[in-house]
Amino acid sequence: MDFQTLHQLSKTELHCHLDGSLSLSCIRQLAKMIDRKLPATDDELRRLVQAPADSENLGDYLKAFDFVAPLLQTKKALQLAAYDVVEQAAEENVRYIEIRFAPVFSLAGGLSLVEATQAVIEGLHQGMATYDIMAKALVCGMRQLPNTDNQTMFKTTAPLLGSTLVGGDFAGNEADFPTNVCAPAIKTAQSLGVPLTFHAGECHCPQNIGEAVRLGIPRIGHATACFDQPALIEKIVETGTTVELCLTSNLQTKAARTLAEFPYQALKKAGAKITINTDNRTVSNTTLTQEYQRYQQAFGTTAADFLAFNLNAIDAAFIPDADKKSLRDQLHQDYATYC
């Protein structure tokens, strides 16, 4: 399939970070709101908000987020940001997207956790009112923060769970804060009924994936380190865990040093529930259509595969069964021409 055909395919995305996915035009709009001076050209601005080409690890990659954080400190800014990411997704025929963000990073201007979360929800509502897309939010705990901070975040935002805020995540510095360190906050979120996904396996640490699966988390973001761990892959399949793959991001962070270290083929062969994601559209300089093209070029991924992966995403989405059925029906109809 050529790029235009891939663009036309209906898509779903479970793993997309708000602060890592803002368009350059949105960044300029947000900066103007706080009188922050930006480089005159987009090429110069892009260098500030994209991961450096010479990233050595996840830590280097995460530094790109520091530039955007000060721009997301008001309700209006968060609304605009959420709308912007929904717009980008809708323009490449994403039918369902979950956008994740850490409300704790938007408190410097005086917002509360609830206010920051509600602002993102409102931005998603505005996007859905404009475009033919279903957009949901996930709140992220940050693994480098004390468990008590993450527990407070989940306790505070859990009452907002409903039609738009649908779940939670843990992101951040995995190398220094492995899964077992986060266990108390994970268990708190689970006790509150927060559906969880969890970043694991981005730092050559398969044990973090295994521990997350053992803790009963149904979705794993990245899971890159399982590529040469057949017993772990078997456990992923056995438990029905869904994997949120992020190819471009993993190559940038060196979670996968080469395509051979990316777990797609091993997971697919084993029958694991795979999904395709951007991770961070801007930081990784990618789109979901570009990700599809990379899978097709690297692995020979077919339209039938893409349909299966999208159906996996709908099965794993934190939404009611009626919404899942509607989305499945739409996907089957949209892919009938290609499969």
From Swiss-Prot:
Taxonomic superkingdom: Bacteria
Residues annotated as binding Zn(2+): 15, 17, 199, 279
Catalytic activity: adenosine + H2O + H(+) = inosine + NH4(+); 2'-deoxyadenosine + H2O + H(+) = 2'-deoxyinosine + NH4(+)
GO biological process assignments: adenosine catabolic process; hypoxanthine salvage; inosine biosynthetic process; nucleotide metabolic process; purine ribonucleoside monophosphate biosynthetic process
The family this protein is said to belong to: Belongs to the metallo-dependent hydrolases superfamily. Adenosine and AMP deaminases family. Adenosine deaminase subfamily.
PANTHER family: ADENOSINE DEAMINASE
Protein name according to UniProt: Adenosine deaminase
Organism the protein comes from: Lacticaseibacillus paracasei (strain ATCC 334 / BCRC 17002 / CCUG 31169 / CIP 107868 / KCTC 3260 / NRRL B-441)
Lineage, highest ranks first: Bacteria, Bacillati, Bacillota, Bacilli, Lactobacillales
UniProt gene name: add
